[in-house]
């Protein structure tokens, strides 16, 4: 049977969480212990999760791609079909989007940048930014959204973020994670520029999550990207 909830002798109450709680702030520099755990102690696991998002999106993009060898007519026909589902100049929705999208994006950036100081981080902040992009798309359509965010943009942004994350933590592969300290100092706990590499990793995760969330919505909406 399952162990009783909250019991002091539960198997999970061992030296591992005790190490996180007692030494997490000193070793990671992150006031938010959860962020210190997933982006420092378990950074490789988080890197794998980010790669799963990117690979899943790329796989769907490949499956839904249009073969250019079939001619330009099929591409033009698909683009025409996409425009059928464009919003019909909904004044109310566009007005609301003009008001809400900027603070939504700013709040998402705030959640990412302050993930090591309190609740938040790359996953939640990226989801907020992705929601803002989806709202903008629903209000103004593909024609305006694709001026600054296309499938190619997503691929390069995600590839760059994942490459930066991998390079930032790759030294552990060669050291075996044996108490090697980051070249970036931990700083003063509670300051925005603290916790060493965690702030950079949060930004990388946020970019991947925001792009993946928006791209999946686009693919569900028009059957490709």
Language-model regions, residue ranges each:
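Short aromatic-rich membrane-water interface segments that cap or initiate transmembrane helices
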Residues: 22, 36-44, 188-203
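Hydrophobic cores of alpha-helical transmembrane segments in multi-pass inner/ER membrane proteins
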Residues: 53-62, 131-137, 201-214
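Membrane-water interface at loop-to-transmembrane-helix junctions
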Residues: 79-100
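Alpha-helical transmembrane segments
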Residues: 138-153
